[in-house]
Structure formats: structure tokens, C-alpha cells
């Protein structure tokens, strides 16, 4: 808040909203969303302003011991929220329904849109796969990274699209696609990591802060 005249309170700048704000003498489009499941904003700005805005944020945050974090940390946190990413969980290999994006699709819209016909056909064909979040048990020295096979009773029934360790919840996680009949919460599956198979349970999406309290705080 020290960097901008725009009020950043929940009342003035709520979750899932956006505004153009000033940051020092820089300008950015601020979106009250993020990819890590915490209270925060995405800042979209001209590339020539990037170093200045970054430096201003770091200086303003010194009293709070602010520190940058890397892409691996961000990936770990997005797994804990079951956030999909292109081209891993969202790909031309499978439909938006298979990626678990049903709530963003309205096939009954009166207007046409790109992909509507293909989406209707994918529904008629019935989804072959469903998106799942997996908790991997008993793995101590390696986590899934993506493309690992997922099995049921020794039969290959899907594959991981992403994986890693969730440090906020202290669990090894994977996102993936499995045959629809094996996608129910509580289903016990296996995943092969570096030649070894581990128990992988289907769990609810967003094992970290499932009600989004932090995002809306």
C-alpha cells in the first residue's frame, strides 16, 4: 500500500477484480489473482518498467523481510491449489472437460464461440479421462514431475501431468488424468516414479486452503 494511491483493501479492491494503478512513477494493470494461493496481485506492465517496479517493491518491503522466490517454489504452491497450467494440464491432447474446466464452459450460450462444436462432440463421445489431484504416499527421495504412469491393479489407467512436493501441507502431490471410473475421491491408485510404484490416493482439489480464505483475506 505504501507504493500506490489506489486503495488495496477488500472493500475497494476485491478478489478477482482488476485496476490500473501507479507504482511510484510506474503504471501497471493489477489483478487481484495469483498462481500460488495466497493474498496477492499479478502486475502486468511495460517490460521497460520491470526493473524499476521490482526494485520499488523490494525497497518498500524491506521492513517486512520481503524476499523473491523462484519458479520451483511457485510450481510447488500451484500444485497445492490444483491449478492447471498450459501445456501440462491444458492441452490439445484432451478436452477442456477432461481438464476439469467444466465450470468455465457454457454450451447453452446463444452466441457461437471458437471450439463450441468440438466441445459438444467431446461431450457426446463421453469423457474418457478425468482430472485428478493425487497424494503420493511413502515416497521419501523423489516426487513425480509429469508423464509418470498411473495404475490400478497393475493396469495403466492414466498419467501424471505435473508433480512435486507441497511444502505448506507437507505432502507429495501429483496432478493427472485417469480413466473416468477411477477418478472418485478416495480411489486408491499407484504411480510409478523412477521405476518404483507408490500408493497414490485421489484427493479433493486444492488441498491447501480449499475455501480460498487466504485469497479473499
What are these regions (language model features)?
Residues 1-217:
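Conserved, structured C-terminal
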